[in-house]
């Protein structure tokens, strides 16, 4: 099934223009867009099938990052592994840039500590940004570790706290 079936010439042109703009900008492609490529541009389809799979793999690795620093390392490492002679080099670079940009906008990224050192300290101390509790009166209470940290003026990065 060709997704452009039943479209006017103008609608087809818009669909195709939008599709190739998405490819150039590294955006995710819909099932209809992939189907169109499979039927009408098999070379680009093969490239984009690979790009979409590798983009998903990068997104998955980014979600496992324990710090913003680690997320950046994952992204730069993925980009550095793109071969100069890869026929999908341009599309992969755009997809990785887009995936990393989208991840940086996410709540998950905003809640990550800045460095791996901070992430390890939080893990070691058992503190997390969501460990605040409310007592019966509605007052915010710190967990024991956070209270000690607060008392000694070594406050953690609580940016983005909900």
Language-model segments: residues:
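Type III/flagellar secretion export determinants
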Residues: 1-162
């Amino acid at each position: 099934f060709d997704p452009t079936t039943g479209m006017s010439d103008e609608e087809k042109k818009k669909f195709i223009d939008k599709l190739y703009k998405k490819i150039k900008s590294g955006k995710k492609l819909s099932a209809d867009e992939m189907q169109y490529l499979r039927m009408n541009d098999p070379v680009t389809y093969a490239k984009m099938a690979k790009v979409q799979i590798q983009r998903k793999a990068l997104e998955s690795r980014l979600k496992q990052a324990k710090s913003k620093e680690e997320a950046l390392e994952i992204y730069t490492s993925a980009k550095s592994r793109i071969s100069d002679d890869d026929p999908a080099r341009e599309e992969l670079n755009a997809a990785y840039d887009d995936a990393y940009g989208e991840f940086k906008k996410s709540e998950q990224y905003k809640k990550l500590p800045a460095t791996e050192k901070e992430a390890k300290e939080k893990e070691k101390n058992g503190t997390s940004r969501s460990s605040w509790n409310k007592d019966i009166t509605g007052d915010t209470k710190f967990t024991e570790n956070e209270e000690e940290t607060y008392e000694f003026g070594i406050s953690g990065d609580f940016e983005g706290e909900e």
